[in-house]
Amino acid sequence: MVSYGKYKSQYEMMTQKPVPALIVQLGLPTMVSMFVTSIYNMADSYFVGQINTSASGATGVVLGLMAILQAVGFMFGHGSGSIISRKLGQKDIDSARKIAATGFYAALIAGFFFLIFGGLLVTPLMRLLGSTDTILPYARAYAICILCAAPALVSSCVMNNILRYEGRAFFAMIGLTSGGVLNIFLDMLFMQKLNMGILGAGLATAISQYVSWALLLTMFILKKTQTSLAPKYINFNISTLGDIITTGLPSLARQGLASISTMLLNNAAGVYGDAAIAAMSIVNRISMFIFSAVLGIGQGFQPIAGFNYGAKKYTRVRQGFFFTLIFGTLLLGIASFIVFLSAGNCIQFFRDDPEVIRIGIPALHAQCIALFFVPFQVCNNMMFQSIGYKFNATFLSSLRNGLCFIPVLLVFSFVFKLAGIQTAQAVADVMTSLICIPFTIKFFAKLPKE
């Protein structure tokens, strides 16, 4: 039985420190991590974009593969982290350690599964994700490197989220940002100095993932955490593993549908050539960079929601939700406004192709307008998953990239052609936020007042 007294100060910080200050404290390191991750994703797009338009399109195709890997990683990561934060809020450290070890090793096994079977089926997988004949050679080379990094990528998602849900976002930031900075350096080395082409971008990403993985693992080895990844805590029974998976289903739904929507988007855009695929890929990466601001703050709110819900401090859950919503909307509003005004320059930075720029500008404008609606849906998703409302979290997480986006994309691309493809995500964002409203009202009406 692990003594609670050793971790008393961490518990008191999570349940007593003023909520706005705590969200900023936990959210800023996460936001920095998200920004760096987005920057190195955009760095790949920038350096690959110097090759040609087909290579630039390949980054959009492989983005679908990375979404699949992240879907599984986040399922185990958010599933484990959400349960851990509530267990720690209840001062049950033993159970938290069992969840942490089980989630980590399950993710590691899943990563090796992707490495083996993904490597064997890489060509049909790239075609399924929307690759054209001209994009395929670039996509295959890039994807093979990503698949080699699958064990690290998937299990890193678990370690990162365990650290965040414990309230140790700074340690998570060290691992992720170090890997991100290294990725950018290796991109320059492999692609500009050694002229390795898109293979260099893939190798840079793979090496960086393993370095990040090693740094995150070091935090657990050095016992900087309340939880442990020691094999003795593994508990692969149906109850434990099932609880992790069902709690993490919203993340699997969100990221899995992101992969499917990327595949459908690439296939729809492919009708208009490689330039359209490249343009939409660039727009998505820019949007994700802006989106990382509110996502970082939202992830800072997650451990606070889980800890305090477990400790029955419901007023702090309320305060956290509304502070995150207001702060996130302000951040995203400012960032979206700046990008809206400089849309052409932003796209040109990644690929100086008139056709790519022409297609990308309207899509980026639409995204910037719709991003004002995103903080509300993010706050809902983060809160419901953190407190164990599995149905609400899974359903709402499925909307933005799936239940709303996919039908809108299919209908709009048929009716409005290219313009429909350019605006589909923006329309889906507005729809998603509107659907979230009744869930939010019902939850806070029933939440005890303490």
Task: Describe the residue ranges of each PLM region.
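Short alpha-helical transmembrane segments in multi-pass integral membrane proteins
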Residues: M1-G27, I84-P151, K193-L249, A305-A370, ...
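N-terminal transmembrane alpha-helices
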Residues: M14-Y46, Q50-I51, A67-G79, I83, ...
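Residue-level signal for transmembrane alpha-helical positions in Major Facilitator Superfamily
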Residues: V24, I39-Y40, F76, F117-L121, ...
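Transmembrane helical elements of multi-pass membrane transporters/channels
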Residues: V24-D44, C145, G179, S208-S212, ...
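Transmembrane alpha-helix boundary and packing residues in multipass membrane permease domains
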Residues: T30, M34, Y46, L63, ...
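Helix-terminus/linker motif at the lipid-water interface of multi-pass membrane proteins
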Residues: F35, I39-G57, M126-D133, L189-M196, ...
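Small-residue-rich hydrophobic transmembrane alpha-helices
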Residues: S56-I116, L153-A172, N266, A279-A343, ...
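Short runs within selected transmembrane alpha-helices of multi-pass transporters and secretion channels
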Residues: G77, I146-R164, A172-G180, A201-A214, ...
